């Protein structure tokens, strides 16, 4: 466990010594801040049936930033190590391959969680200024951030897999972006194709991140997306472990 913690600490520190991490952080805070401002402005002009918290987590700005951050967070995880040759010491010291994979994954997950902490201030400021809560209940907040965690775990695991397949960070980012975007738009097919059967629509809805976020942001916790994203994260990390072992033996 001590070896895992050492690797994990190394990964977390690596983010805060990397310029790209601060670029991602600044980009995300700017886009999320603009998103929150526009949602508040829109709701001041019109009567709506949803809360500012629901609007924030289901807007175009939100999904634009959300899809973009994962390739940027994960592109360096393995690709940079293979390119610089710093992966070789990890293959000779007495650490297990799964410890390396999980340390990189959880290091990325910690940075991802840190990105979302400032958004809690948005809702606190909204409550302070308007004297009204941004959500109907605490469950709505919990559901929103739980879905952020689940989606984040899944998309980060995809980024881990794409990063271990190449030594070029840009290629890793492009592959990750394409894979995540494809999965994202798969959930939109049910809204685009109007002539599909109800069974097909339900199946596509099962994979729709937008629908899942819409449900959880209302405080409705559905166990099916939880099972889906946790199981798919495990699958992606297992594939990453296998790919890492394969590349390690070719060094």
Where do the protein language model's features map onto the residues?
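Aromatic- and glycine-rich beta-strand/loop motifs that create alpha-glucan
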Residues: 1-25
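Hydrophobic alpha-helical membrane-insertion segments
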Residues: 19-32, 108-116, 175-191
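Alpha-helical transmembrane segments of multi-pass membrane proteins
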Residues: 29-42
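Secretory targeting signals
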Residues: 34-37, 51-65, 107-169, 221
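Terminal transmembrane helical anchor/hairpin motif
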Residues: 39-53, 172-243
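Hydrophobic/aromatic residues in alpha-helical transmembrane segments
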Residues: 70-74, 122, 157-158, 239-240
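Helix-loop-helix units of permease transmembrane domains in multi-pass membrane transporters
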Residues: 77-107
């Amino acid at each position: 466990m001590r070896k895992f913690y050492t690797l994990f600490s190394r990964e977390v520190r690596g983010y805060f010594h990397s310029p790209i991490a601060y670029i991602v952080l600044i980009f995300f805070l700017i886009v999320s801040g603009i998103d929150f401002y526009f949602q508040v402005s829109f709701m001041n002009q019109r009567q709506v049936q949803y809360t500012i918290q629901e609007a924030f987590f289901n807007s175009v700005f939100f999904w634009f930033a959300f899809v973009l951050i994962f390739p940027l967070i994960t592109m360096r995880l393995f690709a940079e190590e293979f390119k610089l040759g710093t992966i070789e010491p990890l293959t000779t010291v007495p650490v297990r391959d799964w410890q390396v994979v999980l340390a990189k994954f959880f290091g990325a997950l910690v940075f991802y969680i840190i990105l979302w902490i400032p958004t809690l201030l948005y809702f606190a400021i909204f409550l302070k200024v308007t004297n009204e809560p941004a959500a109907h209940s605490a469950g709505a907040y919990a559901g929103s951030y739980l879905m952020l965690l689940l989606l984040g775990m899944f998309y980060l695991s995809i980024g881990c897999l794409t990063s271990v397949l190449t030594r070029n960070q840009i290629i890793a980012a492009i592959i990750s972006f394409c894979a995540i975007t494809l999965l994202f738009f798969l959930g939109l097919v049910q809204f685009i194709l109007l002539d599909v059967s109800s069974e097909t629509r339900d199946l596509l809805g099962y994979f729709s991140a937008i629908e899942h976020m819409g449900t959880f942001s209302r405080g409705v916790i559905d166990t099916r997306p939880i099972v889906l994203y946790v199981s798919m994260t495990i699958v992606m990390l297992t594939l990453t472990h296998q790919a890492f072992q394969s590349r390690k033996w070719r060094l």
